[in-house]
């Protein structure tokens, strides 16, 4: 089974756009790709969710939102408030396993960060990654505060024996400040490896073909792109 779990250092760091970028590159290589959102929160009935954005950006139609709760809260809390059933970890892992049996790649995008709770028992995205034996890609912000958030996420991964697939900056500003530029070096130091990619701010607003080109330039070869961390970092040496 080829599954990749995409998490973030928090909410709003660009997980969905990064998930779409990975999916777009695999889809362009004619791989069978499925995208799974275990729980969508903060979106009401009939409104567009994260998997809809992925579909629009990539053309991938094999997308699966497994639960939806209207309140913009952690999945466990949102489920409790809505009165609806929370996501069950074992059922979720089984569904992803079934998808993976006939797909080349299954992308699993979490809600919020790695340790956000999905049910009253405290199951997290980290637990799902462990059950799936899937590597975890960490999406982080570019600027001030990113280092601590990233360090905490990486420490949580290591403590649980989970494999790190890489660290990607989800939204790089057009005019990066000093913190952003310095973080390029420090994020790599935390991860003990080059950055796996840097997506430009606004990438999620692009048309499909433009998005594919940006995805290719913004993700490392292991994720299907041409991004070279050293070359990118050299542009912003401080």
From Swiss-Prot:
Assembly and interaction partners: Homodimer.
The keyword Phosphoprotein is annotated on this UniProt entry: no
EC number: 6.3.3.3
Source taxonomy: Bacteria, Bacillati, Actinomycetota, Actinomycetes, Frankiales
Gene3D superfamilies: P-loop containing nucleotide triphosphate hydrolases (3.40.50.300)
Enzymatic reactions: (7R,8S)-7,8-diammoniononanoate + CO2 + ATP = (4R,5S)-dethiobiotin + ADP + phosphate + 3 H(+)
First-listed, main subcellular location of the protein, grouped into a coarse class: cytoplasm
UniProt keywords, alphabetically: ATP-binding, Biotin biosynthesis, Cytoplasm, Ligase, Magnesium, Metal-binding, Nucleotide-binding
GO cellular component: cytosol
Molecular-function annotations in GO: ATP binding; dethiobiotin synthase activity; magnesium ion binding
Residues the record lists as binding substrate: 41
Family of this protein: Belongs to the dethiobiotin synthetase family.
Native source organism of the sequence: Frankia casuarinae (strain DSM 45818 / CECT 9043 / HFP020203 / CcI3)
NCBIfam families (alphabetical): bioD
InterPro entries assigned: DTB_synth_BioD (IPR004472), P-loop_NTPase (IPR027417)
Protein's name according to its UniProt entry: ATP-dependent dethiobiotin synthetase BioD
Subcellular location: Cytoplasm
Pfam families in the cross-refs: AAA_26
